[in-house]
């Protein structure tokens, strides 16, 4: 659909109520796969981290990964879910090249966790409670690479390659209940929800949750209901959403696309759709299947999972501080205003800020550098700020500023030098000769020259108009190439003005 066929977003919200639902797939950090002893790690040569179980070869039998079960229970508890005293695996039957067995071992009517909720903080600081229907265990599928098509898509591809290294990797799929009431903030809620899930699994230590690697993937369901109709619309499920920004953009696009179709008297097809980051659009995939289409039946080769009450309580006691509670604590400890803390949260750099403070930096200084200069450089280079420089490196720059070795202006140059791989903060200072001049001699020479060049300013200072000293201070800082402490320069300017 062309951009011109999209309805204006505000107009779409006036006419329709968006109804949301999310399925978030979290790859678990375990040594081996869900049902085999094949190693579980990202990368590796294609089709090397596999066993007969992963390929569904005759005679091979699955064995449940105990650590994956524990991780799944921990996640369920963190989501406020009830943990099932007995849950069962099921075969989800469908045919696709990345599924060697032609079925996926998942869970159907007896998931490991159910009926929970998660608090989501919106950009304006409001808390929205998102209902969780269930969290269930399953194995991942392989990965297809389409050759010859545009930007790796299947459309127009000459052929496809399949890598089964990912097949059998343990997953937890978190399924929300129907989410009403998001209104015009539906895209922002979608982004905030996925961000919250990412924060939770990282805090638990059960997943790297790197969306660019597929550790965490989101399928976003969206339908529109005409205002006042009281009826649910036909939903679409948008797949291939692999960044927080994409989640927000995909929801906004689908609302505009569906609204345009409905307003023109058309109907929405229940289907999966694929998000394309390069075009900012979704495209039709396949008709959306219902549960009956997958012909679920109990997995005959696996016994039910029946965790003891003692194990559940042991895992509950080991849960870390919830991310939402942690954020409130940090805000109070750091003394940030609501606006300052929200700025950090919205930047996605809270973890980096925490690590920088733990490395010895003052919270306000850490906030200023991460959300200011470092974010500016990251935006200019089109990369994630967290990939540019480490919290320890930032803390070392802040330490040099606090010690008086650097001014803020010089520190910006040092930050760029560290980012460009010129060495540690101190090494960049030494190599570039950026340290603040601590000897008053060169400062006095520059001040005297500036005063002589601006006799009118000198006269004003002598008459008690000390604010006029700013012109001299600026000239001195320029002459010293910023390598001077402005406060010390001001003191000396006032002294020399009266003495000359």
From Swiss-Prot:
<dbReference type="Pfam" id="PF02637">
    <property type="entry name" value="GatB_Yqey"/>
</dbReference>
<keyword id="KW-0648">Protein biosynthesis</keyword>
<dbReference type="GO" id="GO:0070681">
    <property type="term" value="P:glutaminyl-tRNAGln biosynthesis via transamidation"/>
</dbReference>
<comment type="subunit">
    <text>Heterotrimer of A, B and C subunits.</text>
</comment>
<comment type="similarity">
    <text>Belongs to the GatB/GatE family. GatB subfamily.</text>
</comment>
<dbReference type="GO" id="GO:0006412">
    <property type="term" value="P:translation"/>
</dbReference>
<dbReference type="InterPro" id="IPR023168">
    <property type="entry name" value="GatB_Yqey_C_2"/>
</dbReference>
<dbReference type="InterPro" id="IPR017959">
    <property type="entry name" value="Asn/Gln-tRNA_amidoTrfase_suB/E"/>
</dbReference>
<dbReference type="InterPro" id="IPR014746">
    <property type="entry name" value="Gln_synth/guanido_kin_cat_dom"/>
</dbReference>
<dbReference type="Pfam" id="PF02934">
    <property type="entry name" value="GatB_N"/>
</dbReference>
<protein>
    <recommendedName>
        <fullName>Aspartyl/glutamyl-tRNA(Asn/Gln) amidotransferase subunit B</fullName>
        <ecNumber>6.3.5.-</ecNumber>
    </recommendedName>
</protein>
<comment type="function">
    <text>Allows the formation of correctly charged Asn-tRNA(Asn) or Gln-tRNA(Gln) through the transamidation of misacylated Asp-tRNA(Asn) or Glu-tRNA(Gln) in organisms which lack either or both of asparaginyl-tRNA or glutaminyl-tRNA synthetases. The reaction takes place in the presence of glutamine and ATP through an activated phospho-Asp-tRNA(Asn) or phospho-Glu-tRNA(Gln).</text>
</comment>
<keyword id="KW-0547">Nucleotide-binding</keyword>
<keyword id="KW-0067">ATP-binding</keyword>
<dbReference type="GO" id="GO:0050566">
    <property type="term" value="F:asparaginyl-tRNA synthase (glutamine-hydrolyzing) activity"/>
</dbReference>
<dbReference type="InterPro" id="IPR004413">
    <property type="entry name" value="GatB"/>
</dbReference>
<dbReference type="InterPro" id="IPR018027">
    <property type="entry name" value="Asn/Gln_amidotransferase"/>
</dbReference>
<dbReference type="GO" id="GO:0050567">
    <property type="term" value="F:glutaminyl-tRNA synthase (glutamine-hydrolyzing) activity"/>
</dbReference>
<keyword id="KW-0436">Ligase</keyword>
<dbReference type="InterPro" id="IPR003789">
    <property type="entry name" value="Asn/Gln_tRNA_amidoTrase-B-like"/>
</dbReference>
<dbReference type="GO" id="GO:0005524">
    <property type="term" value="F:ATP binding"/>
</dbReference>
<dbReference type="InterPro" id="IPR006075">
    <property type="entry name" value="Asn/Gln-tRNA_Trfase_suB/E_cat"/>
</dbReference>
């Amino acid at each position: 659909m062309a951009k011109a066929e999209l309805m204006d977003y505000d107009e779409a919200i006036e006419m329709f109520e968006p109804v949301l639902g999310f399925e978030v797939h979290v790859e678990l950090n375990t040594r081996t796969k869900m049902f085999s002893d094949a190693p579980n790690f990202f990368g590796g040569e294609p089709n090397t981290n596999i066993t007969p179980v992963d390929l569904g070869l005759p005679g091979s039998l699955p064995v449940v990964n105990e650590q994956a079960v524990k991780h799944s229970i921990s996640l369920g508890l963190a989501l406020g879910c009830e943990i099932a005293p007995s849950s069962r695996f099921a075969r989800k039957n469908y045919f696709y090249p990345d599924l060697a067995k032609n079925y996926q071992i998942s869970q159907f009517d007896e998931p490991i966790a159910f009926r929970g909720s998660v608090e989501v903080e919106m950009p304006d600081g409001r808390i929205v409670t998102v209902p969780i229907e269930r969290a269930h265990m399953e194995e991942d599928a392989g990965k297809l690479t389409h050759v010859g098509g545009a930007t790796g898509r299947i459309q127009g591809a000459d052929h496809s390659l399949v890598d089964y290294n990912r097949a059998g990797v343990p997953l937890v799929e978190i399924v929300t209940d129907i989410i009403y009431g998001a209104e015009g903030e539906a895209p922002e809620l979608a982004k905030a929800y996925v961000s919250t899930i990412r924060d939770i699994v990282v805090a638990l230590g059960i997943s790297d949750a790197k969306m660019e690697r597929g550790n965490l993937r989101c399928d976003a369901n969206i339908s529109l209901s005409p205002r006042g109709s009281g009826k649910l619309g036909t939903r679409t499920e948008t797949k291939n959403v692999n960044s927080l920004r994409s989640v927000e953009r995909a929801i906004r696009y689908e609302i505009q696309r569906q609204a345009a179709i409905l307003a023109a008297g058309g109907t929405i097809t229940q289907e999966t759709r694929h998000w394309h980051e390069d075009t900012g659009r979704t495209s039709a995939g396949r008709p959306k299947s219902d549960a009956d289409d997958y012909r679920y039946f109990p997995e005959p080769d696996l016994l039910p999972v029946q965790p003891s009450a003692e194990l559940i309580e042991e895992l509950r006691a080991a849960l870390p501080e919830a991310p939402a509670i942690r954020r409130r604590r940090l805000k109070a400890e750091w003394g940030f205003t609501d606006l300052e803390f929200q700025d950090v949260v919205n930047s996605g750099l809270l973890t980096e800020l925490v690590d920088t403070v733990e490395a010895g930096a003052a919270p306000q200084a850490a906030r200023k550098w991460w959300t200011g200069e470092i974010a500016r450089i990251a935006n200019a280079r089109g990369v994630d700020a967290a990939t540019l420089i480490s919290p320890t490196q930032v803390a070392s720059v802040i330490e040099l500023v606090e010690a008086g070795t650097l001014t803020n202006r010089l520190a910006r140059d040092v930050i760029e030098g560290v980012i460009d791989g010129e060495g540690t903060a101190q090494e960049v200072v030494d190599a570039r000769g950026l340290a603040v001049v601590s000897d008053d001699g060169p400062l006095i020479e520059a001040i005297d020259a500036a005063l002589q060049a601006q006799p009118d300013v000198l006269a004003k200072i002598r008459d008690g108009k000390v604010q006029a000293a700013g012109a001299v201070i600026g000239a001195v800082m320029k002459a010293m190439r910023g390598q001077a402490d402005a406060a010390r320069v001001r003191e000396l300017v006032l002294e020399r003005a009266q003495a000359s």
